[in-house]
């Protein structure tokens, strides 16, 4: 049901889901679909993402997400952080790659603890062929290059 997941190396793909716990993928060459209901996600992509599907989908309901990719990885970013007014933690997007980052000016939704603001990041590198979709609530998204 819940608990941490750690994968040291995967060649083709990883699909990982936990109800609560950290997900760490030390090396992946193919596609990734990783979801946690509460915890951080850390993924390092190796290779160039040119052979087949190398899309990346990462989602956490409450945690930081860090993705490290090669500097010439061809990708399109679609990033979103939902910050809730009731939370003391407010997430940001930090990226080694250029992208457009937009933060909503006003709180959305009904008054009270359910009010939220989104921070989104969009951009591409090279052909943009690999789709990078990352979403978290009240956490940071960090994109690094190696």
Where in the sequence are the language-model features?
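Intrinsically disordered, low-complexity terminal regions
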Residues: 1-146
